[in-house]
């Protein structure tokens, strides 16, 4: 009886291993922190981590609020990722993109909308002086505004150096 049980156990284990190997592996797209905004850049995972790195590394933070189902967010993401100047200059920033608005009221500035790009300096002050071109949604950018975003990134770095 004991021999039969051992044999059945070995047979059960062997069958399980064989079946497990034959199951097709589900194809899954690897999701990185960049979410397509710049795969070669270093991104932080949370707002708190972004603030900490901005302060300790003495770099401004770029916070991008967006949604994966928003056509305006998707268009800006494409323009941001394809702009070589932005991709190069972004290396001088702490980068965070979130698919929701953080609970920090300082970042709501002029309302809840996406896409929204906000700069935070290393002293943890939101840079309200670096808006986009729209008066009703001051921190939004469209693909046609990508050069303005690039200029605001440059200003965030220049002002950082003169303020500290």
From Swiss-Prot:
Subcellular location as annotated: Secreted; Endoplasmic reticulum
Intervals of motif Homodimer stabilization: 34-43, 49-56
InterPro entries: AGR/TXD, Thioredoxin-like_sf
Gene Ontology molecular functions: identical protein binding
BP GO terms, sorted: positive regulation of cell-substrate adhesion
Membrane-crossing segments per the record: none
First and last residue of the signal peptide: 1-20
Pfam families linked to this entry: Thioredoxin_7 (PF13899)
Cellular compartments per GO CC: endoplasmic reticulum; extracellular region
SUPFAM superfamilies the UniProt entry points to: Thioredoxin-like (SSF52833)
Keywords per UniProt: Endoplasmic reticulum, Secreted, Signal
Gene3D superfamilies per the UniProt record, alphabetical: Glutaredoxin
The keyword Signal belongs to this UniProt entry's keyword annotation: yes
Family membership: Belongs to the AGR family.
Complex formation: Monomer and homodimer.
PANTHER family xrefs: ANTERIOR GRADIENT PROTEIN 2 HOMOLOG, ANTERIOR GRADIENT PROTEIN-RELATED
Protein name: Anterior gradient protein 2
Gene of this entry: agr2
């Amino acid at each position: 009886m004991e021999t039969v049980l051992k044999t059945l156990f070995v047979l059960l284990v062997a069958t399980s291993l064989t079946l497990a190997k034959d199951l097709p592996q589900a194809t899954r797209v690897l999701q990185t922190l960049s979410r397509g905004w710049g795969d070669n850049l270093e991104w932080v995972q949370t707002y708190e981590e972004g603030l900490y790195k901005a302060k300790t590394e003495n770099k401004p933070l770029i916070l991008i609020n967006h949604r994966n189902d928003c056509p305006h967010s998707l268009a800006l993401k494409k323009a941001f990722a394809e702009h070589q100047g932005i991709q190069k200059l972004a290396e001088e920033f702490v980068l965070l993109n979130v698919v929701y608005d953080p609970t920090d009221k300082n970042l709501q500035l002029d309302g809840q909308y996406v896409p929204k790009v906000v700069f935070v300096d290393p002293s943890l002050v939101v840079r309200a002086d670096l808006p986009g071109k729209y008066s009703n949604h001051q921190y939004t950018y469209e693909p046609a505004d990508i050069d303005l975003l690039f200029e605001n990134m440059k200003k965030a770095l220049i002002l950082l150096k003169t303020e500290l």
